[in-house]
Amino acid sequence: TSILDFTTQEKGQTLTEALDVWHKMADGKSSCDYGFHMSITDWNDESKKEIKEMTRQGVTSYKLYMAYDNLKVNDKELFEILSAIEEEHGIVGVHCENGDIIKAVTEKLKSEERNSVRLHPKSRPAEAEAEAINRLLTIAKLAGTPVNIVHLSSKQGLKVVQRARKEGQQVFVETCPQYLILDEKEYNRPGFAGAAYVCAPRLRKKEDREALWEAVEKNEVDMLGTDHCSFNMDGQKTRGKDDFTRIPGGIPGTEQRPMLFYQYGVVEGRTSIERMCQLLADRPAKLFGMYPQKGAILPGSDADLVIWDPDKAWTISAK
């Protein structure tokens, strides 16, 4: 009934210009209510001044990257952005991977091993996620702000969050279906088939999946997102046939999110239908400033209701 997409600021672009571009793509075309997380990639004095205007236009959530040279912010910028968003009572979600470490590991792999999709998981170790989470939480603590860890994928990263929470730090956590259901064996599919599962953070080990499910049941995960970023195999993923680093990172998930969590979480006895509603509706609405207009069945709330048939069978297909 409602989605929050990402609008990404290009280098040299103002936040307002970026938001306008994405509104033009969605206005009159979206089949449901929508809003935007603002991805800040070019932080400067003008961007800082625009934060109040973003609030006026309904933006309550921001996205930052600690990886990707064309997207990432440095530690100083991270501190400044966290502080600026806190003044507007917004929340910052962060892609936590140490981009420099990933780049160094990748260069070493390319010099020593034959190109293969199987190098993708080797190039993005769990340590790179855990280190970035630890650094982010240190910066957030110094800034005196809460922070949202998006698409948490690893047991190591989860342990960093658990430690910070024990020390009293306010940390929100999102994970995604791919990290609860799939694991790194998908990269061992024959030929180039594993490219379909190239994403970042990458799919982890079975023990990481189990740790995340345990965190879901212990109320240590606040939201189930998707990090939806769909690509065709032919013409897009195949760009990386001769160089695994050129495989576009991303998989879809928005449409399948409820059915996947219901099947692998509720039906298989890992969690409850009430927990599913919390992760998919209640918690996101509260964190992103939409509650009680969204995320609740209350007088005056939007009548955004999903009628769920637990007996319906689904087949996920590209056809």
Specify the residue positions occupied by each region the protein language model found.
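Short, surface-exposed loop/helix-turn segments at secondary-structure junctions
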Residues: 190-191, 240-244, 315-319
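Histidine/acidic residue-rich metal-binding segments in metalloenzymes
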Residues: 46-224, 240
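Metal-associated gating/positioning segment near the N- to mid-region
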Residues: 1-29, 46
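Short, surface-exposed connector motifs at secondary-structure boundaries
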Residues: 2-4, 30-35, 59-61, 139-147, ...
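Active-site beta->alpha loop and helix N-cap motifs at the rims of alpha/beta catalytic domains
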Residues: 40-45
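His/Asp/Glu-enriched, well-ordered alpha-helical/loop segment
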Residues: 117-144, 222-224, 230-310
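Secondary-structure transition/capping motifs at alpha-helix termini
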Residues: 28-31, 167-169, 219, 268-272
